[in-house]
């Protein structure tokens, strides 16, 4: 599978760190935090090492986005909890972190004929309207991911819950294109 190994571009995960948060307190204590409830109901806070962004809500829920791997998600959420504790906001110990979505890219290193692929894959699982979007949207049932296929041979996989889901999605596409003689 080395020809089509994936590169994780973004991991989105969520957790609950407390029963509730006072976002104005967090905004005043966290340098660079942005909170304007007229525009958005959550506080936005970005960190740089590892790089990620948080959406923090009054419900105590936190969404982490922008991490490049699942380990970084755990690291930055742990760091966020420590930082909240350091300003006197108690957080839950060992919060359950749920990966909501992984976006990955891959390259098949070949030019693809999307019209032939659309016909070969059948219309029930694909969307291809080149006048509106240059890629073919392929919905795979197992693993449950969506793969955007571009004529350049580049793929974008979204909807995976694990890196393995994304790898498997790429492998499904590669095998199906190979079976159709389109690789």
UniProtKB/Swiss-Prot annotation:
Keywords: DNA-binding, Repeat, Transcription, Transcription regulation. GO terms for biological process: DNA-templated transcription initiation. It comes from Methanosarcina mazei (strain ATCC BAA-159 / DSM 3647 / Goe1 / Go1 / JCM 11833 / OCM 88) (Methanosarcina frisia). This is TATA-box-binding protein 2. It comes from the Archaea. The lineage of its organism: Archaea, Methanobacteriati, Methanobacteriota, Stenosarchaea group, Methanomicrobia. NCBIfam families: PRK00394.1-2 (NF001593), PRK00394.2-1 (NF001596), PRK00394.2-2 (NF001597), PRK00394.2-4 (NF001599). Pfam families: TBP (PF00352). InterPro entries: TBP, TBP_archaea, TBP_CS, TBP_dom_sf. The keyword Cell division does not apply. Disulfide bonds: none annotated.
